[in-house]
């Protein structure tokens, strides 16, 4: 406990050392103004309807070539921000994405980019929660089968990009 307190005091000394040096050069100048009472970090936004949160819509890319879209989706499947979906979606994309038609690719794009919460995708794919009708597509069925892992493939890391 004492060690942690001493470490905290040392760290705070390092943080405030530049401020102390600048203040020692300003002996006759007025003190700095106090910090603003409210910054954007501490503003609490409370909506009347807690189920509704205004989220920006994902931009539709109608003129994107199919190969470019598949490359973008492969990247987005690997970089989800949560390890569970990184592993599930990257292995799914490596297995199926190159064989998708334009319509299937659009469905996959809508699935991974239309949902605002990645945990929803995870819960739907693992069948913890029911899938909403707009996302219950052929692609979601393939993803659910992929998650069941009937082949018993070990998925401890993402597949290589050049494989």
Swiss-Prot record:
Example GO biological process: copper ion homeostasis
GO cellular component terms listed in the entry, alphabetical order: mitochondrial matrix; mitochondrion
Signal peptide region: none
Keywords, comma-separated and alphabetical: Chaperone, Mitochondrion, Transit peptide
Cited Pfam families: Sdh5
Keyword Secreted recorded: no
Transit peptide extent on chain: 1-23
Subcellular location: Mitochondrion matrix
InterPro entries, alphabetized: SDH (IPR005631), SDH_sf (IPR036714), SDHAF2 (IPR028882)
Disulfide-linked positions: none
Purpose: Plays an essential role in the assembly of succinate dehydrogenase (SDH), an enzyme complex (also referred to as respiratory complex II) that is a component of both the tricarboxylic acid (TCA) cycle and the mitochondrial electron transport chain, and which couples the oxidation of succinate to fumarate with the reduction of ubiquinone (coenzyme Q) to ubiquinol. Required for flavinylation (covalent attachment of FAD) of the flavoprotein subunit of the SDH catalytic dimer.
Subunit structure, interactors included: Interacts with the flavoprotein subunit within the SDH catalytic dimer.
Family classification: Belongs to the SDHAF2 family.
Protein name per its UniProtKB record: Succinate dehydrogenase assembly factor 2-A, mitochondrial
Provenance organism: Drosophila sechellia (Fruit fly)
Top-level taxonomy: Eukaryota, Metazoa, Ecdysozoa, Arthropoda, Hexapoda
């Amino acid at each position: 406990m004492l060690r942690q307190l001493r470490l905290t005091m040392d760290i705070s000394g390092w943080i405030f050392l530049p401020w102390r040096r600048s203040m020692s050069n300003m002996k006759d100048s007025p003190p700095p103004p106090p910090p603003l009472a409210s910054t954007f970090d501490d503003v609490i936004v409370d909506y009347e309807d807690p189920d509704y949160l205004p989220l920006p819509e994902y931009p539709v890319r109608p003129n994107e070539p199919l190969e470019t879209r598949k490359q973008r989706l492969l990247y987005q499947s690997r970089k989800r921000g949560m390890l569970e979906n990184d592993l599930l979606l990257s292995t799914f994309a490596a297995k199926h994405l190159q064989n998708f038609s334009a319509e299937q690719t659009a469905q996959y794009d809508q699935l991974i980019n239309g949902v605002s919460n990645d945990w929803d995708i995870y819960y739907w794919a693992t069948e913890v929660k029911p899938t909403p009708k707009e996302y219950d597509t052929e692609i979601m069925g393939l993803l659910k089968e992929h998650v069941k892992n009937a082949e018993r493939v070990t998925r401890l890391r993402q597949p290589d990009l050049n494989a």
